[in-house]
């Protein structure tokens, strides 16, 4: 779920969570358009991963709770998660690690979606 995703991002990155919420074209719920950079591409991939997770019965990625641990920037999704939870956890894990490895461009924060996101 989104609270757990926030915690994962905070575990892997030194940036405040809110720096990612309105970044680029794809880092907000319902984001769309060609990614502006690597970090925005992380968000697009995360959104696409959630779309795949929704294929499991009654799987709602934004709300699904899962079990995981995070220590020293290493995230482990627990093996006892059901299919939906495992899928969502892996989506969030992959995105959090992607965020941590991608450069942050302040010019891509709070962009004008109509002019910059086609």
From Swiss-Prot:
Keyword Iron on entry: no
Pfam families: Phospholip_A2_1
Classification via SMART domains: PA2c (SM00085)
Gene Ontology cellular component annotations, sorted alphabetically: extracellular region
Subcellular location: Secreted
Record-linked Gene3D superfamilies: Phospholipase A2 domain
SUPFAM superfamilies: Phospholipase A2, PLA2
The keyword Membrane is assigned to this record: no
UniProt cross-references to InterPro entries, sorted A to Z: PLipase_A2, PLipase_A2_Asp_AS, PLipase_A2_dom, PLipase_A2_dom_sf, PLipase_A2_His_AS
Bridged cysteine pairs (disulfide): 11-70, 25-117, 27-43, 42-98, 49-91, 59-84, 77-89
GO MF assignments: calcium ion binding; calcium-dependent phospholipase A2 activity; phospholipid binding; signaling receptor binding
Tissue: Expressed by the venom gland.
Key words of the record: Disulfide bond, Secreted
Domain of life: Eukaryota
Example GO biological process: phospholipid metabolic process
Entry function: Snake venom phospholipase A2 (PLA2) homolog that lacks both catalytic and neurotoxicity activities.
Family named by the database record: Belongs to the phospholipase A2 family. Group I subfamily. A49 sub-subfamily.
PANTHER family assigned: PHOSPHOLIPASE A2, PHOSPHOLIPASE A2 FAMILY MEMBER
Protein name: Acidic phospholipase A2 homolog
Organism: Bungarus fasciatus (Banded krait)
């Amino acid at each position: 779920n989104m609270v757990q995703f926030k915690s994962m991002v905070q575990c892997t990155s030194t940036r405040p969570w809110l720096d990612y919420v309105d970044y680029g074209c794809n880092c907000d719920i319902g984001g769309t358009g060609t990614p502006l950079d690597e970090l925005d591409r992380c968000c697009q991939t995360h959104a696409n991963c959630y779309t795949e997770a929704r294929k499991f019965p009654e799987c709602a990625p934004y709300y699904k709770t899962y079990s995981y641990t995070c220590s020293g920037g290493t995230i482990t999704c627990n093996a006892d998660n059901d299919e939906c939870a495992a899928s969502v956890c892996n989506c969030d894990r992959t995105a959090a690690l992607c965020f941590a490895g991608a450069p942050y461009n302040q010019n891509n924060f709070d962009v004008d979606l109509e002019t910059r996101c086609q």
